[in-house]
Amino acid sequence: MTKFVKKSEISNDWYEIDAKNAVVGRLATIISKIIRGKNKNTYSPHMDDGDFVVVKNIEKIKFTGSKYQNKKYYRHTGHPGGIKEITPEKLNEKNKPSEVLKLAVKRMLPSGPLAKKQLTKLKIYTGENHPHGTQNPTMLELSKLNNKNLIRN
């Protein structure tokens, strides 16, 4: 008989990822799997047993090809003719480099209240420093997972 994990048995770990020269889509897939808990053998789609992810150096994230200038994120205000679009380049000009990764991860999660709760486990910071040092996050090396995860210049 298969057992489900109880809330009292869930343990949340902390992971730290350096986003320097990381490809946005590849980084977002790794983060979404960790946040949902798919990296654990106790994964269950209706339970929130994912881990916390701290991403640093978000301003040094990379896009492949010409997506930095040409990719468009759409949203709608709800009014007629209210469709808005913005590119990653314009988001960086507005000092919102974390929105690019947050949108990518959010759109990889299933929609619903559980996904909103899981998205709060993603902590994004510019620069090297972050306030989560006391949780002793485990450093994830993106290049060791797959050498295509980083862009080498």
Each predicted region: which residue ranges?
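Ribosome large-subunit tunnel/peptidyl-transferase-proximal elements
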Residues: 1-103, 109, 113, 136-153
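Acidic, Mg2+-coordinating catalytic module of metal-dependent nucleases/exonucleases
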Residues: 125-141
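C-terminal structural segments of small proteins and small subunits
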Residues: 112-125
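Long, well-ordered early-domain segments
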Residues: 99, 118, 131-134
